[in-house]
Amino acid sequence: MSVRVARVAWVRGLGASYRRGASSFPVPPPGAQGVAELLRDATGAEEEAPWAATERRMPGQCSVLLFPGQGSQVVGMGRGLLNYPRVRELYAAARRVLGYDLLELSLHGPQETLDRTVHCQPAIFVASLAAVEKLHHLQPSVIENCVAAAGFSVGEFAALVFAGAMEFAEGLYAVKIRAEAMQEASEAVPSGMLSVLGQPQSKFNFACLEAREHCKSLGIENPVCEVSNYLFPDCRVISGHQEALRFLQKNSSKFHFRRTRMLPVSGAFHTRLMEPAVEPLTQALKAVDIKKPLVSVYSNVHAHRYRHPGHIHKLLAQQLVSPVKWEQTMHAIYERKKGRGFPQTFEVGPGRQLGAILKSCNMQAWKSYSAVDVLQTLEHVDLDPQEPPR
């Protein structure tokens, strides 16, 4: 992906939206220097193979952006971003799309309100793209030299906006519908998600089968218990009916699980219990003008790059009921010949969970990882990758 393509991706996906006027974004103040102005001449670029840029530049000159998902939200996120160009305009646009003050909720909470699926997904989406604005302001070469992006669950929408596949307001609208539909589906069935740290001999699929049989013995029809996230070797998230997850916790030693922990989410995301949410999201995506990404974006569903707009339409809806193949995505992005260096990796958005996962998937790639702080007001990119995930 050439530098010019990466530039036009960002201007098309976000910066260009500022020039559309009141329909989506306020017109920027006179003299404001933002992504749109900087990249105004970045048009007409020819597309190349996704990693062609790395053939012409040292790997360390290239960058990869990772966008976090639900669970990374924390009261105060966005505080460290408000002094950067365009960020307040992003939150103003979000208020019009959502119908409530997302910035106020992100900054002041309360946490239990922010944690609701209907609120945290839009909050993470906007904070992540605001973090990109901060990164662009401090290190514009990172945006110019980006060769790939990936997002965890709802983070995939932010990655696609960054890559120019959809406009900010349209992407946020899709996230809003997605979050509302997932919240409603979650409330229909007592369900949840269980983080499981296993061992090489752990029997994840057998454990899920046993848990489903246990639920059937209790009279639960069509019980759900399945792997919903592949995080890193021997670590999975299993989702399903609450009774199934309690069974797994009680019998963790039988399945060689080292540690289990219930996640603070409202339902069994990325399982068939989310099927009621598929149609609302599918209809919402029909209203979104999706374009081919100009920076390679990897799908959660199969850990391969998106190829065309129809691909995106289909897989974003399918993602709701499919496991997130994040471990496989990390291998797809960072696998390379022995002796070849790694790109810089930036986690853009709240938390450092994706950095911790990258460390467990690929230690060498993690050595070039940084997190863009969304909490502090200090004007720097936080380069400490060792803080544990929240």
Curated annotation (Swiss-Prot):
- Signal sequence: where? none
- Provide a GO CC annotation, any one: mitochondrion
Question: Which residues does UniProt mark as catalytic?
Answer: 153, 270
Annotated GO biological process: fatty acid beta-oxidation; fatty acid biosynthetic process; mitochondrial small ribosomal subunit assembly
Query: What GO terms are given for molecular function?
Result: [acyl-carrier-protein] S-malonyltransferase activity; RNA binding
What SMART domains does its record include?
A: PKS_AT
Superkingdom of origin organism: Eukaryota
Q: In which pathway does it act?
A: Lipid metabolism; fatty acid biosynthesis
Localization per Swiss-Prot or TrEMBL: Mitochondrion
Q: Which InterPro entries match?
A: Ac_transferase_dom_sf, Acyl_transferase_dom, Acyl_Trfase/lysoPLipase, Malonyl_transacylase_ACP-bd, Mitochondrial_malonyltrans
Effect caused by changing residue 178 to A/G/Q: Strongly decreased affinity for malonyl-CoA
* Sites bearing N6-succinyllysine, chain numbering: 314
Q: Where is the transit peptide?
A: 1-21
Keyword Mitochondrion appears in the UniProt entry: yes
Q: Does the keyword Transmembrane helix apply?
A: no
According to its UniProt record, the EC number is 2.3.1.39
State a single Pfam family of this protein: Acyl_transf_1
The reaction(s) annotated as catalysed by this protein in its Swiss-Prot or TrEMBL entry are: holo-[ACP] + malonyl-CoA = malonyl-[ACP] + CoA
UniProt keywords, alphabetically: Disease variant, Fatty acid biosynthesis, Fatty acid metabolism, Lipid biosynthesis, Lipid metabolism, Mitochondrion, Transferase, Transit peptide
Recorded family membership: Belongs to the type II malonyltransferase family.
| Function recorded in the entry | Catalyzes the transfer of a malonyl moiety from malonyl-CoA to the free thiol group of the phosphopantetheine arm of the mitochondrial ACP protein (NDUFAB1). This suggests the existence of the biosynthesis of fatty acids in mitochondria. Also acts as a mitochondrial small ribosomal subunit (mt-SSU) assembly factor.
Q: Which disease is it linked to?
A: Optic atrophy 15: A disease characterized by visual impairment in association with optic atrophy. Atrophy of the optic disk indicates a deficiency in the number of nerve fibers which arise in the retina and converge to form the optic disk, optic nerve, optic chiasm and optic tracts. OPA15 is an autosomal recessive form.
Protein's recorded name? Malonyl-CoA-acyl carrier protein transacylase, mitochondrial
Q: Which gene encodes it?
A: MCAT
